[in-house]
Amino acid sequence: MRTKVLIIDEVSMVDGELFDKLEELARKIRNNGRPFGGIQLVVTGDFFQLPPVPESNREAKFAFDSATWNTSIQHTILLNHVFRQKDPVFASMLNEMRLGKLTPATIDAFKKLSRPLDFHDSLEATELWVYQVKFSGSI
């Protein structure tokens, strides 16, 4: 097998059960008892952003709660410099929201951003639905 590195982007969306299955599959395919069959694993993502996507009718389990996470992940590098937001005050507000710990000042600042939208054309805002059941009931 030629694969040397497996990169998993948005690892927060990978269910723990799937992570364990991938690890086992890699060991079997490569006939190698090391984690992921000796394939170097590079995972990226923010567990505060996108939750795991489990199989239907099963509770989600984060990849870091999987049985094989601790043996598969050797090093963790925390990236804490924000590149996409240049306003440090707003970046701090977004980080508070990300952590779910908003100060009263941040809540007030977000409330001040609320305003009625005035459409001068016939276009309406797009509605996004997380679950098909909710979408079906909205028609």
Feature locations, PLM:
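Conserved ATP-binding/catalytic motifs of P-loop helicase motor domains
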Residues: M1-I139
